[in-house]
Amino acid sequence: MRLPWIRFAKQKDELNEELQAHLRMAMADRMERGESEDVARRNARREMGNIPLIEDVTREMWGGVWLERVLQDVRYALRQLRRAPGFAVTAMVTLSLGLAAAVAMYTVVDQVLLRPLPYRDAGSLVQITEMGKDGMPGWGNAFLDIAEWQARSHRLQGIAYYDVEGGPGHLNYLEGKDTSIGVSNATVSANLFATLGVQAAMGRTFLEGGNGAVRPEDAHTILLSDAIWRNAFAADPQILGRMVKVDGEAYTVIGVMPRGVAFPLTLAHPLVWVPMIPSSADKVRTRHETPHYETIARLASGASVAAAAHEMQEIQWDVAAQYTDQDNRDHISSIRVTRYEDTLVDDSVRKSLLALGGAAAVLWLIACVNVTSLLLARATARQREIAVRGALGASRGRIVQQLLIEGLMLSSAASLVGIVLATLTLRAFEHGLETQFGIHTVLAPNLRVLCVLLLLTVISALASSVWPALAVARAPIEPALRQGTAQSGTGRTQHRLRAALVVAEIAMSLTLLVACGLLLRTIYTMRHVPLGFRTDHVMVASMTIPSYRYANRDLYKDLYAPLLERVQHLPGVESASLMTDVPLGKDFRIVFSFGDGDGKTATDTRRSKIRAQARAVTPEIQKVFQFHMLKGRFFNDTDTATSLPVVVVNREFIREWEGEGSDPGKFLGTPLFGFRDKKQAVVVGVLDDDRQDGIAEPSQAEIEVCMPQITPGSTFYGPTSIAMSIAVRTERDPATVIPELRDVMRKASPELANSNFTTMEQVVEDSYGSQQLASRLLEIFGGTALVLCIAGIYGLLAYLVTQRTRELGIRIALGAQRVRLMAMVLRQAGGMLMAGLATGLLLAYATSRIVGTLLYGVKPHDPWTMAAVTLILLMGGLAAACIPARRAAGVDPMAALRSE
């Protein structure tokens, strides 16, 4: 890299030596004709002309002089910045904050929304979902339905299916010779990886026997993800053919997938894949007994999503007709075909991230405007210096180049600080994405992010430097040289430019602060929503156990009940309860039918079936959460496996069932519960509504099932279906009980020590979801924008007062009142504030709908929020203006005149 520069330097030396040789020859010739040495040298120089100019012209002909001049400008810019460290640090920190926000948000958007999927032609992959008449998606697609699609669809190819055992949050246990690790186990059709267009990095994938079925020889084989191969087996190259166990069942490793390849992408744990073997249950069409699978396919050549959806809907009408039960037909009556990449991120999350990205871009613009104002002031102060350079022959282009390079040096330094700040921000962002958006990803700057950072660095340098450079370079030279000082060489144009920049800062800051205010009001509203239960002094533990170790056993009798008994006797524990779902968690929704107690469907109710949230609990849950009973009773110790099955519903359930005012006492049931002798349960109590899916979500119909009454064969609280949690109300800080609770759970089953422990207050905090994360980020963005805005107002007014020191001194000497001088400065500030606030209100009104999807209980154009933000900015701006105003009023006329 240094060779061209060394060659250029050598050419310069050779040119200088040649010119000096010509000069010596001319001198020698004149001295031979009788001239003295001094006269000969003077005449020879006059004859040759301007030697430095000859060197410059010759070097320009070589074409490398531009690099020399750039390096000169870089060295000069560094010297100038060292002479003004306060200015350099202020500009660098300001710009680094804007760059950090922009880079951090782009990294998040890139990883979550823009990253290319690790599959061939991922844009043609589609997800197929059976839908009910109510517009709700079903539990998945039945094997026979998928087989029908495979046989009849022409616009979809490679229809494949899969299922993640126990759901996305469930852990399976992979055991090798010397390892045991929790994994997500996906059961997949043999053609899945062919549909995805992915080959194994080592070994092979499953062999297909037709219609996605696996060949018999691959019935007990397994594929490992790259992460599992490296972490659990130390990247052993001899892994192929080795025997491993998943939940106690033996499999032979036949392949390792490439690094970065995962499917489904929404899982938090490393993956293994085993082939799906159709069972007898797959050969029937019933919603409750038939296994259901997620389905993915690839669009045929030339087919569109709309065309595929139309074709699949026609097929689905025939499929639905093959279900004998009307309820089953109603729940699969239509079909939805969606691009797979669009299913990975919820639409509300997508809009939230894009809104936050826009807010970060606005903050970056504010930082650029602030630095532009600083550079304009600095360039104006250096106007006489620049005029001298112009008078000595520097072209306008060279002056602009020098100022641009100075801006680029500042921007480059700011980018280095910005990438560090962005990396620190991303570490905190990962937790928020997981807990409040439900997205599991590792956030780190990649090559695309670094390219964007480089682009933003250059744009920042140009955006903040071009305007000041052109404004100063175009200024006439003679007036600047004639003035005695730099202070008196400024013009009205530069003042107007800086005032316009401050107005833009105020407008953009108000827009950000309005969005921040709307979200803060949203969080305030959500914090005051009645939850329907108490959260203080309550902690919960979500239990994770190896499912295969409790197969064919009474899980409640052998594990849960003894564990609950020991927990209830811990010091400081008031009460404890088991539950399949924690309030504000992901509740399980099923359909209940109403009966007359003899297994027959009732006909005297307003509706014969109802879709409701279902949760199995022990009687002590009422003491833990203190739900409000409206009618009847809650479960007690008399509700056992041999007594009449009982359930408790909420107010919304009654409202949907028979309307307000109905009394409990009706029978209802569902095949899922597995009550003894298939008895239907009777409703014995009505609870007040509570929040289930989230604070911002309305209450749904809910039913509580008495856990001791569920038979051992039921899948309701089985280890491979719905997770089990234990809730504990304590007399002291719940966090202090965790070590003792963990020890009790370890004694019950060693794997329970790895359960997730948290307090209900933290569960509530996490349930604020995207609003919480967005409000925190906008608090940072808005606060930074407010500081930069106030700093911009102060900087401009302080600069104007400094520039007008002589004028102010003369005014005071001529009798001007100091109060009027203060008012003059405050009037200037007020004019900028009014213009900026008016523009900002228009922008805020136009853009506030962008955050509308994040709001709860607040309108996007909330007048109180806009008024409060306007008042805050107005008061902050006037406070910033008071300091320069007092300085203007305190000018000593004698000192001001003497300084000139």
Indicate where each model-derived feature is located.
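Membrane-helix entry/capping segments
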Residues: A44-F87, Y119-R120, G167, T179, ...
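Alpha-helical transmembrane segments
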Residues: L97-S124, T425-E434, M508-H537, R566, ...
